[in-house]
């Protein structure tokens, strides 16, 4: 389970060091093999351990092809999906197309989301946290006790 928010740096080549706790968990669960893709609604990236992505992929592929929203989701998730591997220095290289999609620069945030991680530009992450709530709490969340 991946939790926590980590402020990290990305070098000009697009390499970022994975924080030790997260890196160790990723190496243990998937040998450091990841799949990174674009989020369908926010300008951030989704980082999956390879086995989690492979389990999710059939569900994505099964989305109806004649539904425009489903087709858009499939195009983004599968079209941007890129396999990555943690190198010997504990870093991954994020390709330029994905960096551009999420507006990633030097300062980035790696945010745990349970079975996956999200990768945000620090500026976008802080804007999200500071944005006023736009919607009411969905009914299915009302029973959640924090």
Curated annotation (Swiss-Prot):
Gene: mraZ
One MF term in the entry's GO annotations: transcription cis-regulatory region binding
Keyword Transcription regulation attributed: yes
InterPro entries in the record: MraZ, MraZ_C, MraZ_dom, MraZ_N, MraZ_sf, SpoVT-AbrB_dom, SpoVT-AbrB_sf
Pfam families given in the database record: MraZ
UniProt-listed CDD domains: MraZ_C, MraZ_N
Cellular compartment(s): Cytoplasm, Nucleoid
KW Repeat (keyword) present: yes
HAMAP family: MraZ (MF_01008)
Lineage: Bacteria, Pseudomonadati, Pseudomonadota, Gammaproteobacteria, Cellvibrionales
Assigned keywords, A-Z: Cytoplasm, DNA-binding, Repeat, Transcription, Transcription regulation
Provenance organism: Cellvibrio japonicus (strain Ueda107) (Pseudomonas fluorescens subsp. cellulosa)
Segment forming the signal sequence: none
Domain SpoVT-AbrB: 5-52, 81-124
Protein name: Transcriptional regulator MraZ
């Amino acid at each position: 389970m991946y939790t926590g928010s980590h402020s990290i740096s990305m070098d000009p080549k697009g390499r970022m060091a994975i924080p030790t706790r997260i890196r160790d968990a990723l190496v243990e669960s998937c040998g450091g093999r990841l799949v990174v893709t674009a989020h369908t609604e926010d300008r951030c990236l989704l980082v999956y351990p390879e086995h989690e992505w492979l389990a999710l992929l059939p569900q994505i592929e099964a989305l109806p092809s004649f539904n425009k929203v489903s087709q858009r989701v499939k195009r983004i998730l599968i079209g941007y999906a890129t396999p990555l591997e943690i190198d010997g220095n504990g870093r991954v290289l994020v390709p330029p197309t994905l960096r551009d999609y999420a507006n990633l620069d030097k300062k980035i945030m790696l945010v745990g989301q349970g079975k996956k991680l999200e990768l945000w530009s620090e500026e976008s992450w802080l804007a999200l946290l500071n944005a006023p709530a736009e919607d009411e709490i969905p009914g299915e969340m009302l029973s959640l006790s924090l």
